[in-house]
UniProtKB/Swiss-Prot annotation:
Domain of life (superkingdom): Eukaryota
Protein known as: Protein FAM25A
Matches recorded under PANTHER family: PROTEIN FAM25A-RELATED
InterPro entries: FAM25
Family indicated by similarity: Belongs to the FAM25 family.
TM stretches of this protein: none
Organism phylogeny: Eukaryota, Metazoa, Chordata, Craniata, Vertebrata
Length: 89
């Protein structure tokens, strides 16, 4: 009879241990999922910020180059017109 009680106690302990382990695994899965989700959000934000900065930088460079080219062409045309004007005098 005592052997049967010991076996029953061992089975109960094994069952409780299994349930506790399942609970711990579930808790760890939730934490890992939350951490991965947070890391994904942070990574996406970092990528978006980097792309935005690159776009702004590219826009600024395009604007500067456009202004420089426009200024250079305007100067060249003005210079040519002045030269032609002197030839016509």
């Amino acid at each position: 009879m005592l052997g049967g009680l010991g076996k029953l106690a061992a089975e109960g302990l094994a069952h409780r241990t299994e349930k506790a382990t399942e609970g711990a695994v579930h808790a760890v899965e939730e934490v890992v999922s939350e951490v991965v989700g947070h890391a994904k959000e942070v990574g996406e934000k970092a990528i978006n910020d980097a792309l935005k900065k690159a776009q702004e930088s590219g826009d600024r460079v395009v604007k500067e180059v456009t202004e420089k080219v426009t200024h250079t062409i305007t100067d060249a045309v003005t210079h040519a017109a002045e030269g032609l004007g002197r030839l016509g005098q």
